């Protein structure tokens, strides 16, 4: 049967290998447990008295060690006896003690059932249908949840505008969540006024200010509509119906009019503005109208050059 020896008054620099070398010439050492200035040496010999006699007065680093048989304060003899610690009986051990109330609680199949008190003496637990809390308040405030922690502000200047929109979204979420819970509570109590504001009133929602030079972002929904041409109202002018009405000086026989079949665009002569009639051409047109008898229109101010 293995035994254990107590070794006291050890120096501070003693390790398990050095202590094991002291006992190996006299016995077979299995383990050494050093605790500050004392240790426990486990050996395989049953008779430890000769070993204690030989090592009495042994000196390690100038200190005389104290060696004796290790015993427990509760058990004078080493080893675990076959005695019940509950009823002090030698016929059985503690797990099989009949005085243990948990050993008598068995089911029909002979399986032992263990019961644990999880309340720790705090009292009787409330049931799910406990009417202490009002049902309306339970509905209104039962849906509250912990808002996730806020993300720290990044140091990158390109992310500042997006981070401000993130903070604004968090503020809006908390505001509308509290408003919804208050409305639900008001509806449960039968209140007609409520806590919500009417649609015509304005609610000051916090708006994040963009830093200088950054792009302003918006979290509000924007409705997009296809681009449609503007509607022009009809005009009751005498010349609105005529589609081939031209100015009196817009002649197709002008020397500067380009042909329709030209493969390239017309080139305006250098020094002369485009779509401008000369004075000679304008006088020829007036004479032609007087000869044919057509009424002469009010001429536009000529551009002379």
Curated annotation (Swiss-Prot):
Location of the RRM domain: 3-72
Organism name: Caenorhabditis elegans
GO biological process: oocyte fate commitment; positive regulation of oocyte development; spermatogenesis
The keyword Cell division appears for this protein: no
Presence of the UniProt keyword Calcium in the record: no
Start and end residues, zinc fingers (CCHC-type): 84-97
Gene: rnp-1
Region Disordered, annotated ranges: 284-305
Tissue specificity as recorded in UniProt: Expressed throughout the germline.
UniProt keywords, alphabetically: Metal-binding, RNA-binding, Zinc, Zinc-finger
Protein name (database record): RNA-binding protein rnp-1
Residues that span the membrane, as ranges: none
Phenotype on disruption: Hermaphrodites are sterile and produce no oocytes due to the failure of the germ line to transition from spermatogenesis to oogenesis during oocyte development.
An annotated Gene Ontology molecular function: zinc ion binding
Gene3D superfamilies for the chain: 3.30.70.330
Gene Ontology CC, one term: nuclear speck
CDD domains (UniProt xref): RRM1_2_CoAA_like (cd12343)
The organism's place on the tree of life at top rank: Eukaryota
Biased amino acid composition, Pro residues: 296-305
Pfam families: RRM_1
Known role: RNA-binding protein that is required for the germ line to transition from spermatogenesis to oogenesis and allow for normal oocyte development.
């Amino acid at each position: 049967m293995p035994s254990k020896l107590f070794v006291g008054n050890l120096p501070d620099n003693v390790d398990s290998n050095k202590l094991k070398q002291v006992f190996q010439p006299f016995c077979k050492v299995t383990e050494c447990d050093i605790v500050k200035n004392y240790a426990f040496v486990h050996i395989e010999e049953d008779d430890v008295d000769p070993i204690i006699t030989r090592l009495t007065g042994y000196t390690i680093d100038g200190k005389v060690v104290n060696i004796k048989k290790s015993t427990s304060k509760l058990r004078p003899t080493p080893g675990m006896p076959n005695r019940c610690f509950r009823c002090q009986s030698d016929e059985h051990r503690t797990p099989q003690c009949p005085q243990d109330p948990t050993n008598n609680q068995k089911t029909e199949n002979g399986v032992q059932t263990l019961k644990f008190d999880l309340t720790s003496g705090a009292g009787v637990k409330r049931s799910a249908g406990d009417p202490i809390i009002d049902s309306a308040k339970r509905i209104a405030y039962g849906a509250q949840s912990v808002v996730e922690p806020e993300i720290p502000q990044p140091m990158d200047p390109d992310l500042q505008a997006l981070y401000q929109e993130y903070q604004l979204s968090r503020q809006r979420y908390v505001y509308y969540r509290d408003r919804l819970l208050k409305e639900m509570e008001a509806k449960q109590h039968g209140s007609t006024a409520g806590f919500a504001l009417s649609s015509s009133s304005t609610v000051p929602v916090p708006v994040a200010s963009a830093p200088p030079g950054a792009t302003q972002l918006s979290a509000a929904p924007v409705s997009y509509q296809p681009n449609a041409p503007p509607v022009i109202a009809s005009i009751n002018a005498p010349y609105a119906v005529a589609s081939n009405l031209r100015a009196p000086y817009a002649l197709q026989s002008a020397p500067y009019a380009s042909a329709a079949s030209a493969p390239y665009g017309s080139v305006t002569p250098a020094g002369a503005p485009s779509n401008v009639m000369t004075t000679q051409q304008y006088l020829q047109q007036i004479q032609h109208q007087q000869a044919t008898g057509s009424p002469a229109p009010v001429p536009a101010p000529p551009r002379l050059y």
